[in-house]
From Swiss-Prot:
Localization per Swiss-Prot or TrEMBL: Cell membrane
Listed PANTHER family: HEMIN IMPORT ATP-BINDING PROTEIN HMUV (PTHR42794:SF1)
EC number(s) from the headed UniProt entry: 7.6.2.-
Identification of the protein by name: Hemin import ATP-binding protein HmuV
Function: Part of the ABC transporter complex HmuTUV involved in hemin import. Responsible for energy coupling to the transport system.
Pfam families: ABC_tran (PF00005)
GO cellular component assignments: plasma membrane
Length: 280
């Protein structure tokens, strides 16, 4: 209409979430049911993810661990129940707002173009473009590459890396994002012993710094050593939840995994060790 001045649409600047208090719930699922391919995958799951803690999702193949992680990330829709991030249903957040609040590491990472390692890590800074923290980009990228030990091949094409190297670059991207909620799906799966320990130490460090970390693990000894709490899944439900010392009971694990196991403390550290029972 002539004479009417229309408002200029200016993209909003990213606003970071306020610092979380220790123990604050940064993500939660209540009565969560998820169907994939017409079949139920999660059935009535309740879980909370708290600032300052590492929560490990464990359980046999097909138990629903990755699906639960995807639901907490707002990447997998709920058929019933609610998923909240920073106190609000995930549907209330826009994609850019979610990207400031949670960072996600999928099981596998692949790229169609020959991006260099540093370019891949820099992708983690995309949510902050145009915001007050954009000036942190260089430091965030450099720190993430150093912590994951990928700085030595920063210029190499991502597609030319080994599986373990790709996994560490993908983790560096997540760390560079500097979101207060980290959702990591099997981050140690392709790694050697040394780098498995490196990744879990980074998880603990992020939790000590006040972040909330959710990690899907198959190695129960790693979960016992590094997680504050574990959620043991079986057939789409949480069979038990709590500190590893409470959940990792020999009888329960043997039943859930349908495999006899032995649980005993490490003779020096006291950390729980879980090993399959083997006949002599």
């Amino acid at each position: 209409m002539r004479g009417v001045k229309l408002p200029r649409l200016v993209p909003s600047r990213p606003v970071p979430p306020p610092p979380a208090a220790p123990g604050e719930v940064l993500a939660a699922a209540g009565g969560l049911r998820v169907h994939l391919g017409g079949r139920p995958v999660l059935d009535g799951v309740d879980v909370e993810v708290r600032a300052g803690e590492v929560l490990a999702l464990v359980g046999p193949n097909g138990a629903g661990k990755s699906t639960l992680l995807g639901a907490l990330a707002a990447d997998v829709p709920a058929a019933e129940g609610v998923v909240r991030v920073h106190g609000r249903p995930v549907s209330d957040w826009s994609a850019p707002e979610l990207a400031l609040r949670r960072a996600v590491l999928p099981q596998s990472a692949s790229l169609s173009f020959p991006f260099a390692v540093e370019e891949v890590v820099r992708m983690g800074r995309a949510p902050w473009a145009g915001g007050d923290r954009a000036d942190e980009d260089e430091a965030a990228v450099a720190e993430a590459m150093a912590r994951t030990e990928v700085a030595g091949f920063a210029g190499r094409p991502f597609s030319a890396l080994s599986g373990g190297e790709r996994a560490r670059v993908a983790l560096a991207r997540v760390l560079a994002q500097r979101a207060p909620l980290l959702l990591l799906d099997e981050p140690t799966a392709a790694l050697d012993l040394r780098h498995q320990e490196l990744v879990l130490r980074l998880c603990r460090e992020r939790a000590r710094a006040g972040d909330a970390v959710v990690v899907v693990l198959h190695d129960l000894a790693l979960a016992a050593a590094y997680a504050d709490r574990v959620a043991l899944l079986r057939s789409g439900r949480i069979a038990a939840g709590g500190p590893p010392s409470e959940v990792f009971a020999q009888g329960l694990l043997s039943e859930v995994y349908d495999q006899p196991v032995e649980v005993f403390p490490h003779p020096r550290t006291g950390a729980l060790l879980v090993v399959p029972h083997r006949s002599p």
